[in-house]
């Protein structure tokens, strides 16, 4: 954001978030989210709005840095971000959802099934999607379609579980892989 005019930063941020979602990659919004809370116990209205807008744009994760690394009010900063993000989640509108088209020429069965599973949660009385995952690909596909209900991803590798912790709406659960399906 240093080499572009400051008035372009919000638009660029929104475009980058959209591109990441379309590419099914986790997107983290960071950098000075609550910068004034390094030295002050309360954020500015602009900072609160920045957090809410990141949620409205459907970012996967928010991150604090200096506020918690060396700020005077690290716990207050975390509590503030949590409260603002939770309220923004309640207030977000469906018309802000990013529509992710399926490539008609693609044979990506995982993406197709993920989109159908997310659609099903809005049409049927389904309150969660459960998947297992070695690499996290299926869970990331489900996250990209930004469903209303959580994706419970059972991961056989701790690294996959940690990576999925950043994905929108995904609750990753580690389960050691057993020798065969009969053992589960």
Explain the meaning of each model-derived region.
Residues 22, 80-118:
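Long, charged amphipathic helices and adjacent flexible linkers at domain junctions
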Residues 4-32, 36, 147-148:
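Helical hairpin unit composed of two closely spaced alpha helices linked by a short loop
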Residues 1-2, 50-74:
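Glycine-rich phosphate-binding active-site loops on the catalytic face of alpha/beta enzymes
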Residues 35-57:
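Catalytic cores of alpha/beta
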Residues 32, 54, 142:
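Conserved, mostly hydrophobic/aromatic
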Residues 13, 68-91:
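C-terminal helical cap(s) of enzyme catalytic domains, especially alpha/beta-barrels
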């Amino acid at each position: 954001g240093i080499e572009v005019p400051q008035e372009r930063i919000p638009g660029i941020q929104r475009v980058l978030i959209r591109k990441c979602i379309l590419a099914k990659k986790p997107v983290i919004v960071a950098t000075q989210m609550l910068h004034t809370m390094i030295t002050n116990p309360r954020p500015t209205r602009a900072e609160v709005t920045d957090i809410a807008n990141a949620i409205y744009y459907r970012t996967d994760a928010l991150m604090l840095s200096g506020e918690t690394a060396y700020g005077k009010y690290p716990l207050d900063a975390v509590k503030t971000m949590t409260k603002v993000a939770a309220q923004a989640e309640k207030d977000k509108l469906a018309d802000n959802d990013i529509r992710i088209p399926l490539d008609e020429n693609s044979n990506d069965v995982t993406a197709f099934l993920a989109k159908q599973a997310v659609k099903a949660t809005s049409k049927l009385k389904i309150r969660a999607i459960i998947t297992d995952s070695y690499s996290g690909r299926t869970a990331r596909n489900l996250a990209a379609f930004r469903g209303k209900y959580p994706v419970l991803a059972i991961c056989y590798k701790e690294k996959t579980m940690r990576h999925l912790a950043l994905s929108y709406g995904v609750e990753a659960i580690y389960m050691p892989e057993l020798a065969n399906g009969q053992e589960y």
